[in-house]
Amino acid sequence: MSKVTSSTLLKYKQEGRKFTALTAYDASFASAFDGEGIDVLLVGDSLGMVLQGHDDTLPVTTADIAYHTRCVRRGIERSLLIADMPFMSYATPEQAMENATALMQAGANMVKLEGGHWLLETVTKLTERGIPVCAHLGLTPQSVHVFGGFKVQGRDAENAQRILDEAKALEAAGAQLLVVECIPESLATAITQALTIPVIGIGAGATTDGQILVMHDVLGISSGYIPRFSKNYLKQTGEIRSAVRAYIEEVANGTFPSSEHTFS
């Protein structure tokens, strides 16, 4: 079984083949997801909420992400492994280099950073030094207090254009993947069509190249609240591996996300 790389995902985009991603935080779940064919696993700073019980992702540290990255790495053979860079771990290019290095040494294939134009220098420097970057635009959870809560982004023309411009700039700076979160499907479509690199959506409609969800939402083991853009697949299948297969199949055939999971 060949390993998934950024080149694999680029080929999928060029072929029009949808791919899937999930968060993972330990070897056991990672092994199950990897074995069923999930293409990308993300050690997300969402662990601050779903594992540590915080109200947001801000308390998560680089050491936390590195620990869980090592755990996930030991459980997988095929999936591309991305590690989130947590809040204030990349405020400067120098700080980003130090912390991204630690995450790559922990087993990540790529690091993910939230932000737009202010990140361009950092993205370029990381890429030039052999650290692949996944960018993240739209609802960026580390900026939740700036946004005034977890709110859909890019609904007005000005902000939609800003996000599109930032997506293009991040690709030009060297980003190899882009996550767009909680934006209107029309904006996600424009970004996906404008960029050469693969675009992964969460709460961004069905037109992105790939989809990502938090594993706790997919398996219905969150704290009771499941975001509108997510779906409890365990409820309809009754078994973890079957739930993962159902998620993969619905993304591949275009039935997930449907209109009920999408913002306008």
Swiss-Prot record:
GO terms for cellular component: cytoplasm. One of its GO terms (molecular function) is 3-methyl-2-oxobutanoate hydroxymethyltransferase activity. One of its GO terms (biological process) is pantothenate biosynthetic process. Pathway: Cofactor biosynthesis; (R)-pantothenate biosynthesis; (R)-pantoate from 3-methyl-2-oxobutanoate: step 1/2. The keyword Magnesium applies. PANTHER family: 3-METHYL-2-OXOBUTANOATE HYDROXYMETHYLTRANSFERASE. This is 3-methyl-2-oxobutanoate hydroxymethyltransferase. It comes from Shewanella sp. (strain MR-4). The lineage of its organism: Bacteria, Pseudomonadati, Pseudomonadota, Gammaproteobacteria, Alteromonadales.
